[in-house]
A protein has these predicted regions:
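N-terminal active-site beta-alpha-beta segment that forms phosphate/nucleotide-binding
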Residues: 2-118
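Short beta-strand segments
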Residues: 52-54, 78, 124-125, 157-159
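Active-site catalytic microenvironments for nucleophilic, acid-base chemistry
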Residues: 67, 149, 161
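Short beta-alpha junction loops
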Residues: 81-82, 159-163
Length: 168
């Protein structure tokens, strides 16, 4: 099996594990995950966060976003662009639309934009991960290109425990 085939198999396994959860299990797992994020020093000290809008059974950080907003933190979301680029956008009240992958996404024209080096904390969705915390994403490399530019941010991969897989 090639590396590309192996990664695709890992993505498939990660997505299947997420979809196997029923609604009460998913809600309980998301509540535990969000509570743990809110307890992190990296969260407590962050003023500017990049989260994501959950899609396809991803770990849902809506509770983290709500608490961060309540605390006066700046909450940005990724917008996928040309050349597999990401932009961090803080949406206004009417600043949301369905993005190119069917993901709820900020509308750039109605959002404040942040530079990667302005972020204090980046919570990165993981399709799967291993015991060494190596992340497997969706496969387009958006975050792989973006994260090195987040020079002052703490970067944390986010996934439910069931997304833990064996990566050889």
């Amino acid at each position: 099996m090639t590396i590309a085939e192996e990664k695709q198999a890992q993505r498939t396994a990660g997505r299947a594990a997420r979809k196997a959860l029923d609604a009460p299990q998913r809600a309980a797992a998301n509540a535990v995950l969000c509570r743990r994020v809110l307890e992190l020093d990296a969260y407590r000290t962050a003023h500017t966060l990049l989260l994501y809008a959950a899609f396809g059974g991803e770990a849902d950080l809506a509770a983290v976003a709500a608490e961060a907003a309540r605390q006066g933190k700046t909450v940005a979301y990724p917008v996928c662009g040309e050349g597999f680029s990401l932009t961090a956008a803080v949406p206004g009240a009417d600043g949301w639309a369905m993005g190119q992958y069917g993901i709820r996404t900020p509308v750039l024209e109605r959002s404040a934009l942040l530079q990667p080096e302005q972020l204090d904390l980046v919570l990165v969705p993981c399709t799967a991960f291993d015991a060494g915390c190596y992340r497997v994403g969706m496969g387009k490399g958006y975050y792989d290109r973006y994260l090195p530019r987040c020079t002052r941010a703490v970067k944390i991969g986010i996934a439910l425990e069931l997304s833990l897989i064996h990566i050889s």
